[in-house]
């Protein structure tokens, strides 16, 4: 299966990461010698050569634009700038329907090790026919933000926990019970969203993901490696530490 374009969602304000995001968009937070966004761009270029890269920007978009101007003109990502953020579901739907391509969508607050990213791409490349793919990892039911239901590798549905459910203690049984949870990356097969009409300012999950799942065309790809959703100080500092180790291990230069 060929990925034609990559869309990195980086329009959010990163409110839970203040004061780090007072003067920087979340995707530009430093990771030692690189930053969150640049890490995703470099991995995309390395493991998916030839795929065009798009970045959705809004909050402090000028700083993201300035950052990508460091790339040579022929390799420079395209910016999808939204003065008034549309929300991930509408942005992704518009991009997929305008390009009519196989699109890899990545949340711009994700840190993947090189090994994890390469394994995901390998799973995509092994697909003989075009299909939609959701990257998922296993977590305890108590800690999971989303719960993915699958049958024989085909995703049936996804549900999101409410803020109340996330803060409540669910007890010992939920700590030991493992569930599949979304890892912040999805491949959307061409023409999958033609008749999908999302509301403004909503996330990809659950509505967009369930729309694709209802067609029985959404495969689960297991994420067993290092991946961090950077949405608070603890996760950010963990990503900084892991990024330093990853750069040494793979001798990467940014």
Residue spans of the language-model regions?
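Short catalytic helix/loop segments, enriched in acidic residues and glycine
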Residues: 23-38
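Short beta-strand-to-loop element that shapes/binds the nucleotide-sugar donor at the catalytic cleft/hinge
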Residues: 59, 132-149
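Short, high-confidence coil segments that cap the C-terminus of an alpha-helix
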Residues: 50, 100, 128-131, 216
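A conserved hydrophobic helix/loop-capping motif in glycosyltransferases and polysaccharide synthases
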Residues: 6-11, 27-30
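Short, well-ordered beta-strand micro-motif
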Residues: 30, 135, 148, 187-189, ...
């Amino acid at each position: 299966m060929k990925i034609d374009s990559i869309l990195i969602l980086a329009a959010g304000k990163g409110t839970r990461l203040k004061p780090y995001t007072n003067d920087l968009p979340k995707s530009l937070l430093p990771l030692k010698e690189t930053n969150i966004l640049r890490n995703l761009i470099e991995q995309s270029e390395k493991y998916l050569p030839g795929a065009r890269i798009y970045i959705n920007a809004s909050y402090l978009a000028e700083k993201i634009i300035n950052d990508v101007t460091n790339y040579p003109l022929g390799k420079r990502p395209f910016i999808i700038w939204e003065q008034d953020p549309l929300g991930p579901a509408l942005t992704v739907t518009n991009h997929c329907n305008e390009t009519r391509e196989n699109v890899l969508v990545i949340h711009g607050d994700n840190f993947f090790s090189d090994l994890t990213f390469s394994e995901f791409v390998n799973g995509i490349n092994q697909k003989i026919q075009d299909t939609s793919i959701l990257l998922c990892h296993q977590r305890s039911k108590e800690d999971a933000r989303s719960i993915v239901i699958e049958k024989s590798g085909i995703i049936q549905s996804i549900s999101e926990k409410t803020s109340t459910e996330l803060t409540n203690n669910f007890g010992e049984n939920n700590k030991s019970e493992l569930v599949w949870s979304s890892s912040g990356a999805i491949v959307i097969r061409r023409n999958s969203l033609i008749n999908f009409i999302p509301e403004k300012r909503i996330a990809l999950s659950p509505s967009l993901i369930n729309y694709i799942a209802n067609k029985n065309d959404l495969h689960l790809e297991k994420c067993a490696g290092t991946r961090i959703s950077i949405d608070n100080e603890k996760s950010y500092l963990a990503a900084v530490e892991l990024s330093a180790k990853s750069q040494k291990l793979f001798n990467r230069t940014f």
